Amino acid sequence: MRIAKVRGTVVSTYKEPSLQGVKFLVVQFLDEAGQALQEYEVAADMVGAGVDEWVLISRGSQARHVRDCQERPVDAAVIAIIDTVNVENRSVYDKREHS
Amino acid sequence: MRIAKVRGTVVSTYKEPSLQGVKFLVVQFLDEAGQALQEYEVAADMVGAGVDEWVLISRGSQARHVRDCQERPVDAAVIAIIDTVNVENRSVYDKREHS
Amino acid sequence: MRIAKVRGTVVSTYKEPSLQGVKFLVVQFLDEAGQALQEYEVAADMVGAGVDEWVLISRGSQARHVRDCQERPVDAAVIAIIDTVNVENRSVYDKREHS
Amino acid sequence: MRIAKVRGTVVSTYKEPSLQGVKFLVVQFLDEAGQALQEYEVAADMVGAGVDEWVLISRGSQARHVRDCQERPVDAAVIAIIDTVNVENRSVYDKREHS
Amino acid sequence: MRIAKVRGTVVSTYKEPSLQGVKFLVVQFLDEAGQALQEYEVAADMVGAGVDEWVLISRGSQARHVRDCQERPVDAAVIAIIDTVNVENRSVYDKREHS
């Protein structure tokens, strides 16, 4: 999985029928120190993440093991909203300090 | 998924039998600000996107969860025609301004 | 999928039993203008493409949806021999001009 | 698979229900000489690896063939804790020298 | 698939139970001219390749279609030991000249 930050949304009315009701978020990947990378993805969000929240993104066919996405053509999904990231016993991110 | 712009078509008569009737589009990936990237893909299109339209592309085995593609060897598909893209509450793209 | 040009062959006698009879082609990926990229792949060929022909390559688990490859450990396959490639209403490639 | 070193943890309370009880590790990929690469991944850990241990990471849909992960949306998992790495008959890593 | 050269081994005692008896090889990818690339992978080997042999590597979920790997979390596998590689009717590699 990858760590990412929610940056925006994509809206589409004309789409695969199975995608009705699926929310699409624009997410930007972060490195292990929390620095933004020049890498973006559009991910299906069934967890309910908000802009600026840190999330875990799962990609490829595994993305469909998110609730209600089994038969949907999504190749990236938000699987968790991150509380904390620790690297070498140092806190890189703590959600409480960002709310 | 990735944001892309439709740029052209690929036509093939001599192909896997299961691909009869599948339309192939040449798409160019865009970054989150709508700038063209030097990355192209050929995607199966069951949604009916036109040249210059912004679309969402799903890749890998998930591409086959598009209608009628279950048993087809496609690894990239158009899953939606994009209406709007918003990043940090700023409109990056609105289809109505491009029609 | 990706556009590629057939460049050569790989032969192997000592291999997974399920691969008996599968032909392996060395293909070089092309960009949307038909320029050769420094990216190669070895693809299973059930379509019968020849050296210098332009082909469509499908990669990942989708490659096995090519005829007779369901249970074979191939992660790249030729799915079509290309007739034409058009980008922004300009012909990039036409097979008849290359035969 | 890829060789990696465990560098930290990610904790999330608000996540896909199927992910309850799954431990997430931040791992950094290493090259064949054991040098750290600027590539990070978050992997599910069902093996019980500790910080600084060298591990084998499997990615993509194969990651779910780890115990208890069949229906979980994980796209990267720790599949083994490495004892030794040898390249060209030279020892690159031996766990006993690092405990 | 990718062409690679066997460079070494990884040994692990503490691993996913399903991986008992699986041999892990360190392989280095080669370009179409046989030049070594700075890209390494650890692949499961059910074919019995030796150090310095040229092999074909299949990656992603297709790797599990190698014998006895159906339910194993391997995302890369040796599927063939290469006899010859020809590019543009020129011999790039012939196993007999290397034994």
From Swiss-Prot, chains A, B, C, D, E:
Phenotype when the gene is knocked out: An insertion in this gene leads to rod-shaped carboxysomes and an inability to grow in normal air, called a high-CO(2) requiring phenotype, HCR. When ccmL-ccmM-ccmN-ccmO are deleted no carboxysomes form, cells are HCR and RuBisCO is soluble. Both mutants grow on 2% CO(2).
InterPro entries assigned: CcmL, EutN_CcmL, EutN_CcmL_sf
Practical use: Heterologous expression of 12 carboxysomal genes in E.coli (ccaA, ccmK2, ccmK3, ccmK4, ccmL, ccmM, ccmN, ccmO, ccmP, rbcL, rbcS, rbcX) leads to the formation of bodies that resemble carboxysomes, have densely packed paracrystalline arrays and RuBisCO activity. These structures open the door to generating carboxysomes in plant cells to increase their photosynthesis and productivity, as well as tailoring bacterial microcompartments to specific metabolic needs and molecule delivery.
CDD domains for this protein: EutN_CcmL
Record's subcellular location: Carboxysome
One Pfam entry name: EutN_CcmL
Induction data: Carboxysome size and components vary with growth conditions. When grown in ambient air at medium light (50 uE meter(-2) second(-1)) there are 7.4 units of this protein per carboxysome, the numbers are stable under low light, and increase under high light and high CO(2) (at protein level).
MF-aspect GO terms: structural constituent of carboxysome shell
Keyword Phosphoprotein: no
Keyword set includes ATP-binding: no
Gene3D superfamilies membership: EutN/Ccml
GO BP annotations listed: carbon fixation; photosynthesis
GO cellular component, one term: carboxysome
Keywords annotated in UniProt: Bacterial microcompartment, Carbon dioxide fixation, Carboxysome, Photosynthesis
The BMV domain, residue ranges: 1-83
Domain notes: The tight homopentamer forms a pore with an opening of about 5 Angstroms in diameter which opens into a wider tunnel at the base of the truncated pyramid. The pore is positively charged.
Function of the molecule: Probably forms vertices in the carboxysome, a polyhedral inclusion where RuBisCO (ribulose bisphosphate carboxylase, rbcL-rbcS) is sequestered. Has been modeled to induce curvature upon insertion into an otherwise flat hexagonal molecular layer of CcmK subunits.
Quaternary structure and interacting proteins, as annotated: Homopentamer. Interacts with full-length CcmM.
Recorded family membership: Belongs to the CcmL/EutN family. CcmL subfamily.
Record protein name field: Carboxysome shell vertex protein CcmL
Source taxonomy: Bacteria, Bacillati, Cyanobacteriota, Cyanophyceae, Synechococcales
